[in-house]
Design a protein with these regions (language model features):
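N-terminal subdomain of nucleotide-sugar transferases
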Residues: 1-56, 226
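Conserved donor-binding/catalytic core segment of Leloir-type glycosyltransferases
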Residues: 7, 163, 198-216, 222-225, ...
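Short hydrophobic beta-strand element within catalytic cores of glycosyltransferases
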Residues: 298-301, 311
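Membrane-proximal helix-turn-helix segments that form the acceptor-binding/catalytic region
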Residues: 143-162
Length: 321
């Protein structure tokens, strides 16, 4: 072979990369999106991406921007979790066998990638995302997420080299795999956020952006903003999730539910907000906090998560115990 082969097993935002997937895949995954573009100009490695998608019923292979994308069918997430991703793991392993990579780089523990990498006998590296075991310890979670946490613990123990986004995430991995060599490696922010100008709204306003479920502390946030003392502060909530309907019914007029919004709309709300609020009960390193900080927006958050490394309490925001 002329060049070493690198296989990267990760969720790709196919709708942002391929016009044929634009209406089928609306995920943003900004750190992977940025990495894909950063790798297009390198010539040292033959790069193969292995990614899962519900938008395909059979494997597809696409060559673009000096990289090869192997798109594999995802199928039912519930069935995958209950069967330890059996069929999906087989598909990934077959693809790895065809590629014969010199290095396997796995991203995340939520899908089948980390489990599929257990049997890989070459050099391998895991970039830890998810912290599912920690999430289950910190907030009520559905049965399937507890099952995912079980597969997380099983998979992580089989990796000797693991990168994490934050010291908080390193701590969570050490609880599962104390033998592993850990490196803290932050994920980047899309360049467009560095050039956003702040244009604060005339009246006080805050933004929350994320999944609407217990782990994000959204119940506490809504409870706080329904208090009369904050009736003059507008809270904009971007995102969807299991708690939205119940919490929206409890909301006062100063709480505005935006649902899912585009990247351009997110940037507009970040630009006009006085603060980003992120009351999480546990997060590896939320991208929204980094996006807020690179544009100079203060952040109010908790001490549970990797986001604390970007907030200096009392200077660039507040860290609530």
């Amino acid at each position: 072979r002329l060049r070493p082969v690198l296989a990267i097993a990760a969720d790709l935002p196919l709708g942002r990369l391929l016009t044929s997937f634009r209406n089928k895949d609306r995920r943003t995954i900004p750190w992977i999106f940025s990495l894909f573009h950063a790798l297009e100009s390198q010539e040292d490695f033959d790069i193969h991406w292995i990614t899962l998608s519900k938008a395909v019923s059979a494997p597809e292979t696409i060559r673009m921007r000096n990289q090869t994308i192997h798109i594999l069918p995802l199928g039912s997430m519930g069935r995958n979790i209950l069967t330890a991703h059996f069929l999906t793991v087989r598909r990934i392993r077959k693809t790895l066998n065809d590629i014969q990579p010199d290095l396997l780089h796995v991203w995340g523990v939520e899908q089948a990638y980390a489990l599929a990498g257990i049997a890989f006998r070459g050099k391998k590296l895991l970039s830890y995302q998810g912290a599912l075991t920690a999430y289950c310890q910190r907030a009520p979670q559905a049965f399937l997420l507890h099952m995912q946490a079980l597969w997380e613990r099983m998979a992580v123990k089989h990796y000797d080299l693991i990168t994490c986004e934050s010291p908080w995430a390193c701590g969570r991995v050490a609880e599962i795999a104390p033998h592993a060599r850990l490196s803290c490696m932050e994920y980047g922010v899309e360049p467009s956020f560095y050039h956003l100008a702040r244009k604060p709204s005339p009246e006080p306003s805050c933004l929350f952006a994320g999944t609407i479920y217990e782990l994000k502390g959204i119940s506490y946030l809504v409870e706080a903003f329904t208090h009369p003392s904050l009736s003059h502060v507008q809270l904009f909530i971007a995102g969807n999730g299991a708690l939205r309907e119940r919490l929206e019914a409890l909301s006062t007029p100063n709480i505005h539910w935006l649902g899912s919004i585009s990247r351009a709309e997110l940037q507009q709300h970040l630009s006009t907000a006085w603060f980003l609020v992120h009351p999480t009960l546990g997060d590896c390193c939320p991208n929204i906090v980094k996006e807020a900080r690179v544009m100079g927006l203060p952040v109010i958050t908790t001490e549970e998560g990797g986001q604390t490394q970007y907030v200096q309490d009392g200077v660039s925001g507040y860290i609530v115990p």
